[in-house]
């Protein structure tokens, strides 16, 4: 289930968001604005359900380096590779944010960048 939440910044700004559970992280949040104005516009094939599936049951989770905060969740659905990139906000511990989500026919473009495998299905 995808939860709709209201978050408030330190200055009191109200932010509508979606909340997901993820395989390696307790809580992952995506602003509705981010989804509607970035992901849907640039990657119209991505739905909230796809993001949920990729985060909850990924085939593989990688990182570019041990120090980088971004995690690349990957899952193959109907012969298409879906990616959800999440990152940590340094001021909010234990909370990750969706940076982007996209589909790619080939996963080789990530092999050079993402050398550190954090999770892989058996």
Feature locations, PLM:
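Ribonuclease/tRNase effector modules and their secretory precursors
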Residues: 1-122
